[in-house]
Swiss-Prot record:
A Gene Ontology term for the protein's cellular component: cytosol
Quaternary structure and partners: Interacts (via PQIIIT motif) with PPP3R2 and PPP3CC. Interacts with VDAC2. Interacts with ATG16L1 (via WD repeats). Interacts with PPP3R1, PPP3CA and PPP3CB.
A family per Pfam: DUF4609
Name of protein: Spermatogenesis-associated protein 33
Region called Interaction with ATG16L1, residue ranges: 1-60
GO biological process, one term: flagellated sperm motility
Protein task: Plays an important role in sperm motility and male fertility. Required for sperm midpiece flexibility and for the localization of sperm calcineurin to the mitochondria. Promotes mitophagy as well as acts as an autophagy mediator in male germline cells. Links damaged mitochondria to autophagosomes via its binding to the outer mitochondrial membrane protein VDAC2, as well as to key autophagy machinery component ATG16L1.
Record gene name: Spata33
Sequence motif: PQIIIT, positions: 79-84
Sequence segments annotated as region (Disordered): 1-81, 110-132
Length: 132
């Protein structure tokens, strides 16, 4: 019997909720129309505000003049690239014979047990070297 009493109450609550939903939806429509009229009157400002809002979300109107002054004070130095060509100078050495041996760098013949690792070929690395 207690259950039959609660059923009519639920119907009354549903009726109340439908009326409140209708009034809320009408209010939302009115708010949207008001917002659209504001957007139509100032489309350029809203676009500029939206782009600045995305780039700097926490910036205020007071910070903007300060940043402009800072950027005007700091002047960056642009590096200059100078393209040159190869020099025509030659290296002249006096008193030394013009030999290929003098121009190449040769390692010492006696490196001890590590001599085989200094050779560039793998076959020479496994050759037995007797320097004694």
């Amino acid at each position: 019997m207690g259950q039959s009493k609660s059923k009519p109450r639920e119907k009354k609550e549903e009726e109340k909720s439908t009326t409140t939903l209708v009034t809320k939806s009408k209010e939302k429509v009115m708010e949207k129309e008001a917002k659209q009229s504001d957007k139509e009157s100032q489309p350029a400002e809203s676009l500029l505000f939206a782009t600045s809002k995305h780039s700097r979300p926490s910036s205020s109107s007071e910070d903007k003049p300060e940043t402009k002054q800072r950027s005007s004070k700091k002047r960056s130095v642009i590096p200059q690239i100078i393209i040159t060509r190869a020099s025509n100078e030659t290296l002249i050495s006096y008193g030394i014979p013009d030999n290929d041996e003098q121009r190449t760098i040769r390692e010492h013949a006696d490196w001890g047990p590590y001599h085989r690792h200094r050779s560039p070929s793998t076959i020479a690395a496994y050759d037995v070297h007797n320097t004694e």
